[in-house]
Amino acid sequence: MQLKNPILGLCQQSTFMLSAAKVDQCPDDEGFEVAFAGRSNAGKSSALNTLTHASLARTSKTPGRTQLLNFFKLDDERRLVDLPGYGYAKVPIPLKQHWQRHLEAYLGGRESLKGLILMMDIRHPMTDFDLLMLDWAVAAGMPMHILLTKADKLTYGAAKNTLLKVQSEIRKGWGDQVTIQLFSAPKRMGLEEAYTVLAGWMELADKGAELPAE
């Protein structure tokens, strides 16, 4: 017998709930939430769409198109949250500051937030934004898992070397609270590992359904 990852079915049936410009517009602060963060063009929306097998998150050629906290329902207790992207140049500074204020309020005060998935473009990892998110997560005691996205853009050997290098840097600077993996949305690389992390944070790790082995 083999175990089916319990989060898989929930992700496949996920639906859009609402968008929030401010924390007081978010759903009730109960249950389990996992948030997805990343600089613009880090592949966040593509990763989220691949994990949910749907076009839930808006993808765009214009960096920073996601301007709101977008909530997606997995079941009555569990949600995924697509956070605004950062690093774009075409957005007015006052609007950036507005997003940053409310993002910080969400990250710092959300009791149902159980973990943070941080997307880094494997070709440009550890940007200033990434370092800020790492500092915040460790200081807040928030579990973080990093997806080194667009791993298909490098050879496997080069991707593996980057993974080991970034992993070593993170352990030295931030300890073992942060985990990391390779990920590619087009190649569907790293899905099972990411699902396992989500299941653990959402307390589904021991609820796998047994399936006949193929």
From Swiss-Prot:
UniProt keyword list: Cell cycle, Cell division, GTP-binding, Magnesium, Metal-binding, Nucleotide-binding, Septation
GO biological process: division septum assembly
One Gene Ontology term, aspect cellular component: cytosol
A Pfam family per the record: MMR_HSR1
Cofactor: Mg(2+)
InterPro entries named among the record's database cross-references: G_ENGB_dom (IPR030393), GTP-bd (IPR006073), GTP-bd_ribosome_bio_YsxC (IPR019987), P-loop_NTPase (IPR027417)
Keyword Cell cycle: yes
Domain EngB-type G: 30-204
Entry annotated with the keyword Transport: no
Superkingdom as given in the UniProt entry: Bacteria
Binding residue positions for Mg(2+): 45, 66
Molecular functions per Gene Ontology: GTP binding; metal ion binding
Binding site for GTP: 38-45, 64-68, 82-85, 149-152, 182-185
Its biological purpose: Necessary for normal cell division and for the maintenance of normal septation.
Membership in a protein family: Belongs to the TRAFAC class TrmE-Era-EngA-EngB-Septin-like GTPase superfamily. EngB GTPase family.
Name of protein: Probable GTP-binding protein EngB
